[in-house]
């Protein structure tokens, strides 16, 4: 879920802390990617088309296709991605996880109803909401990335917190996730939409933590309190206090303790259980592996060609010719000379307006039904494929 309304609050109140750019301008950058978030995007990408990719056992492989295509594109742009996988969530998150299960159950019931009524539009909508990342899918993603020569970090706790630790430790330039709580974990740079398909024509939205704090006119501790008041995964928020009011009240009262004293008896309603002190501690002292212990993990190596063929073609029924094409592109990307970075590409923005992108790739000649599905997946994960 992240932090409710935080991105818009920052765009409204600290617009100079947000910049837009295109993926290709991240050449030479190392980025830590929230793997679960990225793979979830890939899983639902084909839900809109009703063209789920599956293996011989009928298991969906959309996430592997998306991971292969998008990671290859990043490598071709000279970006070095590191994928960070979630570990055990904090106990305080159990309530939010239970709510997600309930929403998934409702979505499954609504999907079945839409199926009975033959309402295809609602079927697609509810089908997307039933999607959850399984442990098997997560393990398959790790296996694919390692075979591609891309580093994988398994966080002891929340992936966003581990990404932030890698960024604070100087091992990567940015945390790439859609969850705004990466900023609450004090990642120096947050890059949203980095794993989106270029076909979506949505620019990368980059937040700089130091400028966010300065723009909002608060301390780091106050920023954490604002995020808690906005609403996060670890506790319910106070009814009647949204993002802008949270900012104003923390500026006025200094912290949640003083705020609670001053709203007592008024129309604001705090949750019966409001463990804000524990939530604060989660954000300030998250369960992470120190970046100093992960230096040797952050290595990008040659792809395991035969391993990829065995896994993707023989186990997952990917088209061999297309897989070998990806392998060739990955190898070619490693042979490119290092370019000098020019950091003047970024332009500050006040809203998430789109920028022009390249036109989508032309359709290839029709082959088998399976191959057509693979092409559809490519179109949803990359706007242009190198021949």
Curated annotation (Swiss-Prot):
SMART domains in UniProt: 53EXOc, HhH2, XPGI, XPGN
PROSITE patterns: XPG_1, XPG_2
Binding-site residues for Mg(2+) 2, renumbered to this chain: 179, 181, 233
Molecular function terms from GO: 5'-3' exonuclease activity; 5'-flap endonuclease activity; DNA binding; magnesium ion binding
Residues noted as binding Mg(2+) 1 in the record, renumbered to the chain: 34, 86, 158, 160
GO BP annotations listed: base-excision repair; DNA replication, removal of RNA primer
PTM note: Phosphorylated. Phosphorylation upon DNA damage induces relocalization to the nuclear plasma.
Cofactor(s) it depends on: Mg(2+)
Matches recorded under Pfam families: XPG_I (PF00867), XPG_N (PF00752)
Entry's EC annotation: 3.1.-.-
Biased composition (Basic and acidic residues): 361-371
Region (N-domain): 1-104
Keywords, in A-Z order: DNA damage, DNA repair, DNA replication, Endonuclease, Exonuclease, Hydrolase, Magnesium, Metal-binding, Mitochondrion, Nuclease, Nucleus, Phosphoprotein
Enzyme class: hydrolase
Positions of DNA binding: 70, 158, 231, 233
Cofactor binding description: Binds 2 magnesium ions per subunit. They probably participate in the reaction catalyzed by the enzyme. May bind an additional third magnesium ion after substrate binding.
Annotated segments matching region Interaction with PCNA: 338-346
Region listing for Disordered, in residue ranges: 332-387
Subcellular location: Nucleus, Nucleolus; Nucleus, Nucleoplasm; Mitochondrion
I-domain as annotated region, ranges: 122-253
Family the UniProt entry places it in: Belongs to the XPG/RAD2 endonuclease family. FEN1 subfamily.
HAMAP family assigned to the protein according to its UniProt record, in alphabetical order: Fen (MF_00614)
PANTHER family, alphabetized: FLAP ENDONUCLEASE 1, FLAP ENDONUCLEASE FAMILY MEMBER
Function description: Structure-specific nuclease with 5'-flap endonuclease and 5'-3' exonuclease activities involved in DNA replication and repair. During DNA replication, cleaves the 5'-overhanging flap structure that is generated by displacement synthesis when DNA polymerase encounters the 5'-end of a downstream Okazaki fragment. It enters the flap from the 5'-end and then tracks to cleave the flap base, leaving a nick for ligation. Also involved in the long patch base excision repair (LP-BER) pathway, by cleaving within the apurinic/apyrimidinic (AP) site-terminated flap.
Name this polypeptide is given: Flap endonuclease 1
Biological classification of the source: Eukaryota, Discoba, Heterolobosea, Tetramitia, Eutetramitia
């Amino acid at each position: 879920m992240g932090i409710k309304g935080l991105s818009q609050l920052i765009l409204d109140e600290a617009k100079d802390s947000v910049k837009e750019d295109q993926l290709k301008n991240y050449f030479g950058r190392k980025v830590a990617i929230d793997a679960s978030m990225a793979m979830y995007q890939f899983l639902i990408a084909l839900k809109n088309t009703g063209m789920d990719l599956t293996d011989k056992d009928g298991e969906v492989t959309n996430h592997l296709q998306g991971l292969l295509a998008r990671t290859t594109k990043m490598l071709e742009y000279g970006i070095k991605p590191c994928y960070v996988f979630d570990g055990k969530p904090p106990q305080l998150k159990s309530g939010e996880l239970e709510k997600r299960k309930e929403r998934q159950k409702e979505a499954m019931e609504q999907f079945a109803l839409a199926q009975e009524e033959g309402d295809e539009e609602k079927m697609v909508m509810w089908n997307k909401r039933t999607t959850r990342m399984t442990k098997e899918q997560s393990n398959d993603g790790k296996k694919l990335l390692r075979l591609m020569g891309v580093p994988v970090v398994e966080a002891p706790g929340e992936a966003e917190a581990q990404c932030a630790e890698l960024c604070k430790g100087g091992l990567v330039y940015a945390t790439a996730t859609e969850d705004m709580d990466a900023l609450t974990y004090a990642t120096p740079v947050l890059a949203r939409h980095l794993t989106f398909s270029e076909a979506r024509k949505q620019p990368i939205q980059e937040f700089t933590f130091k400028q966010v704090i300065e723009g909002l006119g608060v301390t780091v501790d106050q920023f954490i309190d604002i995020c808690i008041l906005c609403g996060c995964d670890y506790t319910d928020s106070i009814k009647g206090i949204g993002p802008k009011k949270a900012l104003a009240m923390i500026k006025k009262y200094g912290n949640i303790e003083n705020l609670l004293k001053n709203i007592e008896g008024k129309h604001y309603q705090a949750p019966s259980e409001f463990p804000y002190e524990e939530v604060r501690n989660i954000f300030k002292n998250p369960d992470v592996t120190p970046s100093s212990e992960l230096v040797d993990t952050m290595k990008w190596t040659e792809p395991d060609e035969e391993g990829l063929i065995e896994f993707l073609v023989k186990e997952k029924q990917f088209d061999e010719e297309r897989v070998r094409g990806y392998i060739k592109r990955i190898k070619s990307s490693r042979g490119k000379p290092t370019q000098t970075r020019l950091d003047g590409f970024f332009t500050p923005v006040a809203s998430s307006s789109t920028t022009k992108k390249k036109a989508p790739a032309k359709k290839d000649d029709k082959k088998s039904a399976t191959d057509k599905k693979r092409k559809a997946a490519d179109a949803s994960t990359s706007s242009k494929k190198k021949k």
